[in-house]
Amino acid sequence: MSGRRGKIINPRTRGAVRNVGFRNLISDPFAISSILIGLISWVITLGGCISVQVNEDFPRFTWWGIAFQFLIILMLIGFYIYDLVDYYRNFLTASIGVAFVYSTNSANYLIYGSGNQKAAASAGVVLLSMVNLIWIFYYGGDNASPINRWVDSFSLNGIRPSPFEAAKIKAYRRSSKQTQFRGSSVKLTHSTNNLHSASENLGLDNGFYNNPHTSNYVSSTALTEFENTGPPYPSASDLPTNNNAPLRSPQLGNNTIGDTYITATTNNNTNTTMGDTMGLYADLADESFPYRVKALYSYEADSADAYEMSFEQGEILMVSDIEGRWWKAKKESGETGIIPSNYVTIIDNDTEA
Protein backbone atom coordinates (compact mmCIF):
# COMPACT_ATOMS: atom_id res chain seq x y z
CA MET A 1 0.00 0.00 0.00
CA SER A 2 1.17 3.53 -0.69
CA GLY A 3 2.15 5.90 2.09
CA ARG A 4 -0.71 8.41 2.00
CA ARG A 5 -1.64 10.41 5.06
CA GLY A 6 -3.81 8.37 7.40
CA LYS A 7 -3.27 5.24 5.32
CA ILE A 8 -2.66 2.02 7.22
CA ILE A 9 0.32 0.21 5.73
CA ASN A 10 1.89 -1.40 8.78
CA PRO A 11 1.05 -5.13 8.96
CA ARG A 12 0.36 -4.74 12.67
CA THR A 13 -3.03 -3.24 11.83
CA ARG A 14 -4.05 -6.53 10.28
CA GLY A 15 -3.02 -8.52 13.33
CA ALA A 16 0.17 -9.75 11.63
CA VAL A 17 3.54 -10.43 13.24
CA ARG A 18 5.11 -7.31 14.79
CA ASN A 19 7.30 -5.43 12.32
CA VAL A 20 10.78 -4.79 13.76
CA GLY A 21 13.12 -2.28 12.17
CA PHE A 22 14.45 1.25 12.17
CA ARG A 23 11.72 2.11 9.67
CA ASN A 24 9.18 2.14 12.52
CA LEU A 25 10.97 5.18 13.92
CA ILE A 26 11.70 7.18 10.77
CA SER A 27 8.17 6.62 9.40
CA ASP A 28 6.64 8.37 12.44
CA PRO A 29 7.16 12.16 12.06
CA PHE A 30 6.25 12.90 15.68
CA ALA A 31 8.63 10.30 17.09
CA ILE A 32 11.64 11.15 14.94
CA SER A 33 11.23 14.94 15.32
CA SER A 34 10.66 14.94 19.08
CA ILE A 35 13.53 12.52 19.72
CA LEU A 36 15.90 14.58 17.55
CA ILE A 37 14.94 17.78 19.38
CA GLY A 38 15.41 15.96 22.67
CA LEU A 39 18.87 14.76 21.64
CA ILE A 40 19.94 18.24 20.52
CA SER A 41 18.65 19.73 23.78
CA TRP A 42 20.46 17.04 25.75
CA VAL A 43 23.77 17.78 23.97
CA ILE A 44 23.38 21.53 24.65
CA THR A 45 22.62 20.81 28.29
CA LEU A 46 25.58 18.45 28.65
CA GLY A 47 28.03 20.90 27.05
CA GLY A 48 26.77 23.83 29.11
CA CYS A 49 26.90 21.90 32.38
CA ILE A 50 30.45 20.71 31.68
CA SER A 51 31.61 24.29 31.05
CA VAL A 52 29.85 25.53 34.20
CA GLN A 53 31.47 22.86 36.38
CA VAL A 54 34.95 23.90 35.21
CA ASN A 55 34.54 27.41 36.61
CA GLU A 56 32.44 26.80 39.73
CA ASP A 57 30.78 24.18 41.85
CA PHE A 58 27.90 22.38 40.16
CA PRO A 59 25.03 20.43 41.82
CA ARG A 60 25.81 16.73 41.59
CA PHE A 61 22.16 15.76 41.43
CA THR A 62 21.87 17.55 38.08
CA TRP A 63 24.29 15.03 36.55
CA TRP A 64 21.94 12.22 37.50
CA GLY A 65 19.07 14.09 35.85
CA ILE A 66 21.10 14.43 32.65
CA ALA A 67 22.00 10.72 32.67
CA PHE A 68 18.38 9.74 33.37
CA GLN A 69 17.20 11.88 30.46
CA PHE A 70 19.63 10.12 28.13
CA LEU A 71 18.28 6.73 29.25
CA ILE A 72 14.74 7.89 28.46
CA ILE A 73 15.77 8.89 24.93
CA LEU A 74 17.51 5.55 24.36
CA MET A 75 14.46 3.62 25.60
CA LEU A 76 12.17 5.60 23.31
CA ILE A 77 14.34 4.76 20.31
CA GLY A 78 14.38 1.06 21.26
CA PHE A 79 10.61 0.91 21.84
CA TYR A 80 9.90 2.45 18.45
CA ILE A 81 12.32 0.17 16.62
CA TYR A 82 10.78 -2.95 18.19
CA ASP A 83 7.24 -1.54 17.96
CA LEU A 84 6.68 -1.76 21.72
CA VAL A 85 5.51 1.77 22.44
CA ASP A 86 1.89 0.79 23.11
CA TYR A 87 3.01 -1.87 25.60
CA TYR A 88 5.04 0.57 27.71
CA ARG A 89 2.99 3.77 27.56
CA ASN A 90 2.37 3.85 31.31
CA PHE A 91 6.04 3.23 32.05
CA LEU A 92 7.11 5.94 29.60
CA THR A 93 4.66 8.45 31.05
CA ALA A 94 5.87 7.85 34.61
CA SER A 95 9.56 7.88 33.64
CA ILE A 96 9.26 11.03 31.54
CA GLY A 97 7.39 12.65 34.42
CA VAL A 98 10.39 11.99 36.68
CA ALA A 99 12.74 13.38 34.01
CA PHE A 100 10.51 16.47 33.77
CA VAL A 101 10.97 17.08 37.50
CA TYR A 102 14.76 16.72 37.14
CA SER A 103 14.98 19.08 34.17
CA THR A 104 12.77 21.78 35.70
CA ASN A 105 14.72 21.59 38.96
CA SER A 106 17.99 22.11 37.07
CA ALA A 107 16.44 24.95 35.08
CA ASN A 108 15.50 26.68 38.33
CA TYR A 109 19.18 26.67 39.35
CA LEU A 110 20.73 27.58 36.00
CA ILE A 111 18.32 30.11 34.56
CA TYR A 112 18.98 32.70 37.27
CA GLY A 113 22.76 32.32 37.09
CA SER A 114 25.14 34.65 35.28
CA GLY A 115 27.59 33.80 32.53
CA ASN A 116 27.42 32.35 29.05
CA GLN A 117 28.01 28.80 30.26
CA LYS A 118 24.97 28.85 32.54
CA ALA A 119 22.91 30.49 29.81
CA ALA A 120 23.68 27.63 27.41
CA ALA A 121 22.98 25.02 30.07
CA SER A 122 19.72 26.70 31.09
CA ALA A 123 18.58 26.86 27.44
CA GLY A 124 19.23 23.14 27.12
CA VAL A 125 17.27 22.15 30.25
CA VAL A 126 14.38 24.44 29.30
CA LEU A 127 14.15 22.74 25.89
CA LEU A 128 14.31 19.33 27.60
CA SER A 129 11.50 20.36 29.94
CA MET A 130 9.33 21.38 26.98
CA VAL A 131 10.01 18.13 25.13
CA ASN A 132 9.27 16.11 28.28
CA LEU A 133 5.96 17.92 28.75
CA ILE A 134 4.93 17.15 25.17
CA TRP A 135 5.88 13.50 25.64
CA ILE A 136 3.86 13.28 28.86
CA PHE A 137 0.82 14.72 27.09
CA TYR A 138 1.16 12.30 24.16
CA TYR A 139 2.13 9.04 25.87
CA GLY A 140 -0.19 9.72 28.80
CA GLY A 141 -3.20 9.89 26.50
CA ASP A 142 -5.03 6.99 24.89
CA ASN A 143 -4.57 6.33 21.18
CA ALA A 144 -8.26 7.07 20.69
CA SER A 145 -7.95 10.62 22.04
CA PRO A 146 -8.44 13.39 19.45
CA ILE A 147 -4.91 14.80 19.83
CA ASN A 148 -3.25 11.37 19.51
CA ARG A 149 -5.36 10.48 16.48
CA TRP A 150 -4.45 13.76 14.81
CA VAL A 151 -0.73 13.26 15.51
CA ASP A 152 -0.80 9.62 14.37
CA SER A 153 -2.63 10.54 11.16
CA PHE A 154 0.68 11.92 9.82
CA SER A 155 2.48 8.65 10.49
CA LEU A 156 3.13 6.24 7.64
CA ASN A 157 2.32 3.44 10.09
CA GLY A 158 -1.25 4.65 10.45
CA ILE A 159 -3.32 5.37 13.54
CA ARG A 160 -2.37 3.19 16.48
CA PRO A 161 -5.01 0.83 17.93
CA SER A 162 -6.60 1.86 21.21
CA PRO A 163 -6.93 -0.65 24.11
CA PHE A 164 -9.61 1.54 25.68
CA GLU A 165 -11.62 1.64 22.46
CA ALA A 166 -11.18 -2.12 21.97
CA ALA A 167 -12.54 -2.79 25.48
CA LYS A 168 -15.45 -0.43 24.81
CA ILE A 169 -16.25 -2.21 21.54
CA LYS A 170 -16.17 -5.62 23.23
CA ALA A 171 -18.55 -4.39 25.93
CA TYR A 172 -20.85 -2.92 23.29
CA ARG A 173 -20.72 -6.14 21.28
CA ARG A 174 -21.53 -8.19 24.37
CA SER A 175 -24.55 -6.04 25.24
CA SER A 176 -25.73 -6.08 21.60
CA LYS A 177 -25.54 -9.87 21.52
CA GLN A 178 -27.61 -10.07 24.69
CA THR A 179 -30.20 -7.72 23.21
CA GLN A 180 -30.34 -9.73 19.99
CA PHE A 181 -30.65 -12.96 21.97
CA ARG A 182 -33.59 -11.60 23.95
CA GLY A 183 -35.24 -10.42 20.75
CA SER A 184 -34.66 -13.81 19.12
CA SER A 185 -36.15 -15.54 22.15
CA VAL A 186 -39.34 -13.50 21.80
CA LYS A 187 -39.56 -14.34 18.09
CA LEU A 188 -38.88 -17.99 18.81
CA THR A 189 -41.62 -18.06 21.44
CA HIS A 190 -44.09 -16.46 19.03
CA SER A 191 -43.15 -18.92 16.28
CA THR A 192 -43.41 -21.84 18.69
CA ASN A 193 -46.94 -20.83 19.63
CA ASN A 194 -47.81 -20.59 15.94
CA LEU A 195 -46.40 -24.06 15.33
CA HIS A 196 -48.41 -25.43 18.25
CA SER A 197 -51.60 -23.82 16.98
CA ALA A 198 -50.98 -25.26 13.54
CA SER A 199 -50.42 -28.71 14.98
CA GLU A 200 -53.71 -28.49 16.90
CA ASN A 201 -55.57 -27.48 13.75
CA LEU A 202 -54.04 -30.40 11.89
CA GLY A 203 -54.90 -32.85 14.62
CA LEU A 204 -51.30 -33.56 15.62
CA ASP A 205 -50.44 -35.03 18.98
CA ASN A 206 -48.77 -32.59 21.38
CA GLY A 207 -45.80 -34.84 21.90
CA PHE A 208 -43.32 -32.12 21.07
CA TYR A 209 -44.59 -29.66 23.67
CA ASN A 210 -45.18 -30.65 27.26
CA ASN A 211 -46.78 -27.31 28.14
CA PRO A 212 -46.77 -24.90 25.23
CA HIS A 213 -48.32 -22.08 27.23
CA THR A 214 -45.57 -21.96 29.86
CA SER A 215 -42.52 -23.07 27.88
CA ASN A 216 -40.71 -20.29 26.00
CA TYR A 217 -38.29 -22.49 24.08
CA VAL A 218 -38.44 -25.53 21.85
CA SER A 219 -35.62 -28.00 21.46
CA SER A 220 -33.73 -28.35 18.20
CA THR A 221 -34.75 -32.02 18.08
CA ALA A 222 -38.40 -31.08 18.18
CA LEU A 223 -37.96 -28.52 15.43
CA THR A 224 -36.09 -31.01 13.27
CA GLU A 225 -38.81 -33.60 13.68
CA PHE A 226 -41.50 -31.04 13.02
CA GLU A 227 -39.81 -29.89 9.81
CA ASN A 228 -39.75 -33.47 8.61
CA THR A 229 -43.35 -34.32 9.54
CA GLY A 230 -44.45 -34.04 5.95
CA PRO A 231 -45.68 -37.45 4.77
CA PRO A 232 -43.78 -39.38 2.11
CA TYR A 233 -45.27 -39.82 -1.29
CA PRO A 234 -47.97 -42.48 -1.08
CA SER A 235 -47.55 -45.79 -2.77
CA ALA A 236 -49.61 -46.86 -5.73
CA SER A 237 -51.98 -48.78 -3.47
CA ASP A 238 -52.77 -45.60 -1.56
CA LEU A 239 -53.69 -43.60 -4.65
CA PRO A 240 -57.45 -42.98 -5.07
CA THR A 241 -59.21 -44.21 -8.15
CA ASN A 242 -60.70 -40.79 -8.81
CA ASN A 243 -58.03 -38.64 -10.44
CA ASN A 244 -59.78 -35.46 -9.31
CA ALA A 245 -59.78 -36.43 -5.66
CA PRO A 246 -57.09 -34.91 -3.46
CA LEU A 247 -54.31 -37.09 -2.11
CA ARG A 248 -54.64 -37.67 1.62
CA SER A 249 -51.52 -38.39 3.56
CA PRO A 250 -51.09 -41.74 5.30
CA GLN A 251 -50.77 -42.13 9.04
CA LEU A 252 -47.43 -41.41 10.71
CA GLY A 253 -47.17 -43.59 13.78
CA ASN A 254 -49.95 -42.50 16.10
CA ASN A 255 -50.36 -39.12 14.42
CA THR A 256 -53.13 -38.91 11.86
CA ILE A 257 -53.22 -35.89 9.58
CA GLY A 258 -56.87 -35.31 8.86
CA ASP A 259 -57.18 -32.46 6.36
CA THR A 260 -53.68 -32.01 5.01
CA TYR A 261 -53.21 -32.40 1.28
CA ILE A 262 -50.16 -33.20 -0.78
CA THR A 263 -49.76 -30.90 -3.75
CA ALA A 264 -47.04 -30.39 -6.31
CA THR A 265 -45.97 -27.12 -4.68
CA THR A 266 -45.54 -28.23 -1.09
CA ASN A 267 -42.35 -30.28 -1.55
CA ASN A 268 -43.54 -33.05 0.80
CA ASN A 269 -44.54 -30.50 3.45
CA THR A 270 -47.83 -28.74 3.98
CA ASN A 271 -48.02 -25.02 3.37
CA THR A 272 -48.77 -24.43 7.02
CA THR A 273 -45.80 -26.42 8.27
CA MET A 274 -43.26 -25.00 5.81
CA GLY A 275 -44.45 -21.42 6.21
CA ASP A 276 -44.21 -21.40 9.98
CA THR A 277 -40.88 -23.21 10.03
CA MET A 278 -39.23 -21.00 7.41
CA GLY A 279 -40.60 -17.89 9.09
CA LEU A 280 -38.94 -18.94 12.32
CA TYR A 281 -35.47 -18.97 10.81
CA ALA A 282 -36.00 -16.00 8.51
CA ASP A 283 -36.60 -13.75 11.52
CA LEU A 284 -33.31 -14.77 13.06
CA ALA A 285 -31.31 -13.88 9.93
CA ASP A 286 -32.93 -10.56 9.04
CA GLU A 287 -30.00 -8.37 10.13
CA SER A 288 -26.63 -9.35 8.70
CA PHE A 289 -25.17 -5.86 9.35
CA PRO A 290 -26.52 -4.96 12.81
CA TYR A 291 -23.98 -2.28 13.78
CA ARG A 292 -23.93 1.34 12.59
CA VAL A 293 -20.60 3.17 12.47
CA LYS A 294 -19.53 6.67 11.50
CA ALA A 295 -16.29 7.38 9.65
CA LEU A 296 -13.91 9.56 11.66
CA TYR A 297 -11.55 10.03 8.72
CA SER A 298 -11.63 9.54 4.98
CA TYR A 299 -10.06 6.31 3.76
CA GLU A 300 -8.89 5.37 0.27
CA ALA A 301 -8.84 1.67 -0.47
CA ASP A 302 -5.69 0.14 -1.87
CA SER A 303 -6.10 -0.66 -5.56
CA ALA A 304 -4.12 -3.88 -5.08
CA ASP A 305 -6.57 -5.17 -2.45
CA ALA A 306 -9.94 -6.05 -3.95
CA TYR A 307 -11.53 -6.49 -0.52
CA GLU A 308 -10.93 -2.98 0.83
CA MET A 309 -13.59 -0.29 0.53
CA SER A 310 -13.13 3.49 0.38
CA PHE A 311 -15.29 5.88 2.39
CA GLU A 312 -15.51 9.57 3.25
CA GLN A 313 -15.29 11.30 6.61
CA GLY A 314 -18.68 11.41 8.35
CA GLU A 315 -20.16 8.64 6.18
CA ILE A 316 -22.49 6.16 7.92
CA LEU A 317 -21.76 2.48 7.30
CA MET A 318 -23.32 -0.79 8.44
CA VAL A 319 -20.98 -3.40 9.96
CA SER A 320 -21.59 -7.13 10.28
CA ASP A 321 -19.09 -7.90 13.04
CA ILE A 322 -16.89 -5.76 15.29
CA GLU A 323 -14.18 -8.28 16.15
CA GLY A 324 -10.62 -7.70 14.97
CA ARG A 325 -9.05 -4.68 13.33
CA TRP A 326 -10.70 -5.03 9.92
CA TRP A 327 -14.50 -5.10 9.75
CA LYS A 328 -16.84 -6.11 6.97
CA ALA A 329 -19.02 -3.11 6.17
CA LYS A 330 -21.81 -2.15 3.81
CA LYS A 331 -22.64 1.24 2.33
CA GLU A 332 -26.12 2.60 1.74
CA SER A 333 -25.56 1.97 -1.95
CA GLY A 334 -25.13 -1.74 -1.22
CA GLU A 335 -21.36 -1.83 -1.77
CA THR A 336 -19.56 -4.12 0.69
CA GLY A 337 -15.92 -4.52 1.70
CA ILE A 338 -13.52 -4.40 4.63
CA ILE A 339 -12.64 -1.22 6.50
CA PRO A 340 -10.06 -0.41 9.23
CA SER A 341 -11.75 -0.37 12.63
CA ASN A 342 -9.69 2.55 13.95
CA TYR A 343 -11.06 4.85 11.25
CA VAL A 344 -14.67 4.56 12.45
CA THR A 345 -16.64 4.77 15.68
CA ILE A 346 -19.77 2.86 16.66
CA ILE A 347 -22.96 4.89 16.98
CA ASP A 348 -26.31 3.89 18.43
CA ASN A 349 -29.15 3.14 16.09
CA ASP A 350 -31.07 6.15 17.34
CA THR A 351 -28.09 8.54 17.07
CA GLU A 352 -28.24 11.21 14.40
CA ALA A 353 -25.52 10.86 11.79
Curated annotation (Swiss-Prot):
Residues 51-60, 112-118 are extracellular. This is High osmolarity signaling protein SHO1. It is found in: Cell membrane. Keywords: Cell membrane, Membrane, SH3 domain, Stress response, Transmembrane, Transmembrane helix. SMART domains: SH3. InterPro entries: SH3-like_dom_sf (IPR036028), SH3_domain (IPR001452), Sho1_SH3 (IPR035522). The gene is SHO1. It comes from Candida glabrata (strain ATCC 2001 / BCRC 20586 / JCM 3761 / NBRC 0622 / NRRL Y-65 / CBS 138) (Yeast). The lineage of its organism: Eukaryota, Fungi, Dikarya, Ascomycota, Saccharomycotina. CDD domains: SH3_Sho1p. Belongs to the SHO1 family. Its main location: membrane.
